[in-house]
Amino acid sequence: MKPVKTITKHNWFLRLIKKIIRTVRVTPKLAFNQENLPEKAIYIANHSGAAGPLTLSVYFPKYLVPWGAYPMTENYFRRWKYLYYVFYRQKIGYGKIRSFFLATLFGIISKTLYNGVKLIPTYPDARLKTSIRKSIEHLEVNNSLLIFPEDSSGGYKEEIETFHSGFVFLANKYYQEKQVHIPIIPLFYHKAS
């Protein structure tokens, strides 16, 4: 496995996508304390449908390595199944035709996008240890993490109602191993902003 390196910018493909988005979209309001952003931190944010991760990746002034659903790092068919059945149908609430179309298109480019942002896959089982280890490696080279902790099994909400505690476990594990408190910083994005 390749060693984790400090990341200061996205690859050329993601920079191009970001430039296109910034050209056609009005800059949204992101709620966070812009003063004294730490060198490395765990940023937690609401997903806000499909828009949250993309918006934060494009407009946040710091490079963030996101946690994400593990099926999105697998082969095309598994990505498509996750996108169609879980992401678009269950979480976003789209109809069958729209979900099929979007899952088919996004399934094609998603692997390239997620590899470009160095997505750390998260798991609902013992493999989460791999996610924690990879996260600590990123923090050790001063890469900040972006985690969407909300429980989205009933769909995405504008405000987080309940959340998974993986980010707290990660912060505790980091402290146990490194004797350093890692800042946990909340971000908020509202797609109507």
Describe the function of each predicted region.
Residues M1-F13:
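Helix-enriched interaction subdomains in cytosolic or periplasmic regions
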Residues P3, I17-S193:
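Soluble catalytic domains of membrane acyltransferases
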